[in-house]
């Protein structure tokens, strides 16, 4: 108050000395009846920089009508109020419950809660559940502005997290294969707030050295989320002691790694009283996972955050929004079959993933330069900027394949951006621009059409789209017969499958009751996803076990998915 000469309240001015000497303080705790509050708010304007309605403006309305009463509190400690985020965080801890109480109330999580108590003691904590996910249509495109059609599965990553007084995050895992880890959230510089600044931080020598020292550590996914949330929100987050349990198969295309990111974000949000929109949450999670070296989108994180039990949810990106949810009818089942071929982003495959993303970028840069009359803001816009023939012509106008040196010659005005993209992956020799771009625009159309097909119960057509979609990732085997004209019937060549996964899809597509099958997840290993007639699900699983798993001497790893709710916090 010393820096203020006067303060104006309800048309009266008070000097700083008067304010400092007053025995009365407005604690900003107001009690209304609902009808009166609604009426008062309707009289308040929003003519301010934020365009907001202020609750305090209602006081003047009630005062004019003689309807204000003041309650004097003799003991300030009896007030439950706060003025800052730090005070709110401190208050919220009083409402947390001990782990032993959580153990009694949530017996389904008894294993991880008991492990938490054993490692950290019977402390006040929260439980966070972040499920795995499957994407029925819309692979490799959400970072280009495409949409996804997703559902969460029952397998999940579960955190039991207790707040700390410092900014240290300590991690322990029920599975002894994952060693304990610890780091300080405050290591990342505070001035990193925008996406561009975050990318610059990730490409810094300091970050590269940190990653090289901890390459392959499961804790890097937690670290990436914590760093990104702390920097973007410009708030000193409290640390936490965490016990983790995961039931999502690792490196199987069901997003076990992204579930660590989402669980971290949910736990930090709960313990720090963060208030974010779904869009903010999803975008920061997607960017947080870039810390491990990948440059994918936020589709997996969005699926985990926004899924709805019993439904397939349509999600849009750039900007993010939640679209239509379609209930899965009892006539259909979704089966996931693990190929038992792992794809680990930290062990080299990230170069291949990032090279595909780079091919999208390069194709888009060249198409925009070639067709300046088109309004193209995101890669997605190519798919809807003309007729089928026009779009094919646009794609054919750029080099089918191109090297880095050729790109630098063709785009001399973009050398800085090109070098920035080159730095995300090893040089593949040449980039398949046409195959990648054709897959992208066709998958964008398929994903956009998916809710209508599902809502109209056109499952045979949807299954055909799944087969074509997989052909865009296929590296071997027999592509599906092309049965129509239009972008949705094109497959392109993203080529992130494997011979084993292709063989599994071919086996399933020849099985009675299977409507369609495709690669699940980013690829280079992982699972196959199938849409199946429900009354044939048992026979499909039988053939899977006998003709795939048993024949290859692999553990039987297929299951029927039950669509579950998205991420949750249990207090």
Question: Could you say what each language-model-derived stretch is?
Answer:
Residues 172, 239-246, 276-288, 463-468, ...:
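Beta-strand segments within the central parallel beta-sheet cores of soluble alpha/beta enzyme folds
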Residues 134, 138-142, 245-263, 513-531:
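Glycine/serine-rich anion-binding loops at beta->alpha junctions
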Residues 16-31, 45, 79, 324-325, ...:
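A short glycine-threonine-serine/GTX helix/turn-capping micro-motif
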Residues 1-49, 56, 63-67, 73:
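Conserved core of the sugar-phosphate nucleotidyltransferase
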Residues 201-208, 226-227, 234-248:
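Glycine- and acidic-rich phosphate- and metal-coordinating loops
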Residues 232-239, 268-284, 534-547, 551-552:
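Phosphate-handling active-site elements
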Residues 97-133, 137, 158-216, 311-518, ...:
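C-terminal nucleotide
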Residues 252-340:
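Fold-level recognition of mixed alpha/beta catalytic cores in primary-metabolism enzymes, strongest
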